[in-house]
């Protein structure tokens, strides 16, 4: 089936083109739209899990992106016209530790019977709100995550350390890499990656909001 994208006239005045191949005032190629969406979805086992969780075919990219599209990479939200409630669910250090230890038994991306897997790639990862001083939580609606947590694998126990080393080395070489930190939960090393497409603002009274910044990856740039 052919996919179509039409920008709202008001968006054309105040917004931006989503990618170099999704331009204003042109007939947008259907394949470019599908590729853009595809590169926002998880891959491998992550895609299989999301497909099974929502009972949606892996080939039905548009239904999948609607299901998990409240917080994809960048600033764009994919959703129906339903108004999403905004909530912040705090997670204690103890609860997070137990979920990390038992992630082989209970999928780390499922919290409160909802999947939080909304990022591209094949690695296990968890989007999380980090407010400092070991205060963690999961946001819904207008509250977006500030960090991405990545985990070790049984077959590759040095995965976290290797990615941390590469990110730090890249920064020393002058590359604008994301801020990373390794935190230990019981015996598990976890990589905290500060999202460069998010900005956390905290008021003096403790109220906070997370701003989103639009980004695209190399695949979306090259179509």
Give the location of each predicted region.
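Phosphate/dinucleotide-binding and metal-coordinating scaffold of catalytic cores
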Residues: 1-223
């Amino acid at each position: 089936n052919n996919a179509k994208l039409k920008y709202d006239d008001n968006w054309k005045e105040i917004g931006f083109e989503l990618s170099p191949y999704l331009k204003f005032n042109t007939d947008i190629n259907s394949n470019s739209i599908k590729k853009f969406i595809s590169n926002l979805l998880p891959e491998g086992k992550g895609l299989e899990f999301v497909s099974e969780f929502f009972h949606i075919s892996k080939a039905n990219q548009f239904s999948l992106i609607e299901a998990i599209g409240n917080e994809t990479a960048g600033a764009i939200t994919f959703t129906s016209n339903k108004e999403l409630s905004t909530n912040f669910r705090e997670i204690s250090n103890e609860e997070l530790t137990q979920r990390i230890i038992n992630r082989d038994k209970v999928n780390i991306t499922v919290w409160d019977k909802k999947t939080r897997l909304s990022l591209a790639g094949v690695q296990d990862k968890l989007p999380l709100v980090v407010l400092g001083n070991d205060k963690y939580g999961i946001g819904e609606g207008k509250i977006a995550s500030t960090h991405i947590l990545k985990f070790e694998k049984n077959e590759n126990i040095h995965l976290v350390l290797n990615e941390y080393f590469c990110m730090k080395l890249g920064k020393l070489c002058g590359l604008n890499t994301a801020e990373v930190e390794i935190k230990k939960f019981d015996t598990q090393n976890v990589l905290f990656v500060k999202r460069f497409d998010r900005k956390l603002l905290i008021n003096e009274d403790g109220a906070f909001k997370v701003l989103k910044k639009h980004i695209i990856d190399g695949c979306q740039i090259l179509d």
